[in-house]
Amino acid sequence: VIGILGLFFRFGGAFNYTNSINWESAARLSSNLLNETILDDVQALYRVKSIAKRAEELEVINLTPQELSEKISAIGGTFNGKDFDGSFTRTITTERLAEQPQSINIVLGESYGLWPFLSEYNEPGAYLVEQGRKYAASPQAMSTQLALAQGTGTMPAINGLLTGMPDTGLYPNYEGESFKQPYGLGIGSVMKKLGYKTVFWYGGFSTWQNVKNFTLSQGFDEFHDASEMPSEDGNAWGVGDKDLFKAISAYMDQ
């Protein structure tokens, strides 16, 4: 009996991940305090163990200035002898735009397949990505079919956008150094330097994977999540795209 109860609590009130209140998906409310009360004691202990295990798996790499210069050069940078961000900074000599855009919107989508845009899937593609094909055909649009995914999950992709660095399993959203100052190559830092107000909209919940605190530490002025968006078909992971973009549109109309 004790073993069965232990298994039950291990998965957070169920015998499988899908129906459980797992520590990675228990953040359903906007209050950190209430989210902590939702999480049962065994799952809370399992969370500590999981995060500690991830941190232990990280490697400390010490490079000499010469080795650092060689590695920066190998990925297109010019080592300036001072810092990483400066080694990848480029200053333009000719302005490309006569007028700076009033707003710039970047959509980071998970599991958005390219196949509906391909000619061999023209019939379903014409319906599924009708608007997307119109944008792609615009003379002002650009696209590529040669790209690598930032990572294998949601947080690695978000980390890549926020830090400007490739995913190497370092978990920057949990690293204390990440909260001391923003990464210079992250999208928030770049847009702030260009004079923009930075607003991050997340279709999930803010306390998942520490995403809100991490985002605000990386040069974003505001963070909005699923708890602020009316939705009738939301789930443990957040709201649907329709409700997300509806909330964003209403905000931009203000």
Q: Can you say where each PLM-predicted feature lies in the sequence?
A:
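Soluble catalytic regions of membrane-associated enzymes that act on cell-envelope
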Residues: 13-254
